[in-house]
Regions:
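Conserved NAD(P)H cofactor-binding loop of Rossmann-fold oxidoreductase domains
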Residues: 58-66, 91-92
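Catalytic loop of short-chain dehydrogenase/reductase
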Residues: 80, 86-112
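NAD(P)-cofactor binding segment of oxidoreductase domains
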Residues: 63-87
């Protein structure tokens, strides 16, 4: 399965990235620290490039502006109702201040989303 994750460099995004990699999936990560800014048109274009080859899009990158919402809208437009594609949209400021306790708890619940992703 081809999975693309924004905000993959730390926190929940990093844990999801590593988890899906460990399951043998092809996982691509996009983060501000690796040069992809969801708040810019160019950054979103880079993330959307080749999206037709992706099965699951994890919209996890945090944005002070409307970048995450704009990116979600653009992914929906590119996929144009393709029901074989899956979007996991993560939006919680609680994840911004993670620590060893709450990140482990969050990752332990990822199995709850897997049936949706793999359906």
């Amino acid at each position: 399965m081809n999975i693309r994750i924004t905000g993959h460099a730390r926190g929940l995004g990093r844990s999801l990235y590593e988890h899906f990699k460990s399951l043998g999936h092809n996982v691509e990560g996009y983060s501000l620290s690796t040069g992809y800014d969801i708040n810019t048109v160019e950054g979103r274009k880079q993330i959307l490039d080749g999206l037709d080859q992706v099965d699951v899009f994890v919209n996890n990158a945090w944005s002070e502006y409307s970048g995450q919402t704009k990116l979600l809208e653009e992914v929906i437009q590119v996929w144009d109702g393709n029901k074989d594609k899956k979007i996991l949209n993560i939006s919680s400021k609680a994840c911004y201040n993670y620590n060893d306790v709450n990140i482990d708890l969050a990752v332990s619940y990822t199995h709850l989303t897997l049936p949706t992703i793999y359906s």
